[in-house]
Amino acid sequence: MPIMTTNKFSLTELLVTLSIVLILSAILLPVLNRGREIAKTIACTGNMKQSLTGLVMYLDTYDVVSTQSWTDTLLETGLVPQSQVSSLRCPSWVRKDDTHKNVFGMRRVMGDAHTLHITGSPSDYVLLADSLNLDTSRQFINFYGNWGPHKLVVHYRHHRKANAGFLDGSVRSSSQRELSEKGCPRYVY
């Protein structure tokens, strides 16, 4: 009767295999994390597009919307269903609460009300953007600058770009320079 022999891995072979696996995982993890962030940027763009579409529809019907309560307006009129309140937020930013002010920021204007009556091209007018309240580190309902007591700013959280919704209904990922060229407040973070 033949004697069965079993081949065992040597310690060296096991360590070499383990080191190869660790090196490959170290190479792949940053790529996977980058892919996850790109997916969040795309989801943010979709959420902003939905919010922007509701805002433009509301403005087209009622001619004016308050910068202080635009989210309440969209929810109350059903332009954004209560079940889809998360579409008013960027998924890349961790929420500490779910208040109506923890959302995309609307451009702050004199009188706190927006209309469709602007000078210039609607494709150059920023209406919504990724926002941040510098005092609380939360998204905020509007933005205009970091001067005085007001620290409500555009936040460049997507690889040094902010998603911005324009009055023509388009949403683009834009750098600080691009938004400044569009007349967006220069007070940014």
Residue spans for each PLM region:
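N-terminal single-pass transmembrane signal-anchor helix
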Residues: 5-36
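Short, well-structured segments within or immediately adjacent to enzyme catalytic domains
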Residues: 37-189
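Short, Lys/Arg-enriched N-terminal segments with co-localized hydrophobic residues
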Residues: 1-3
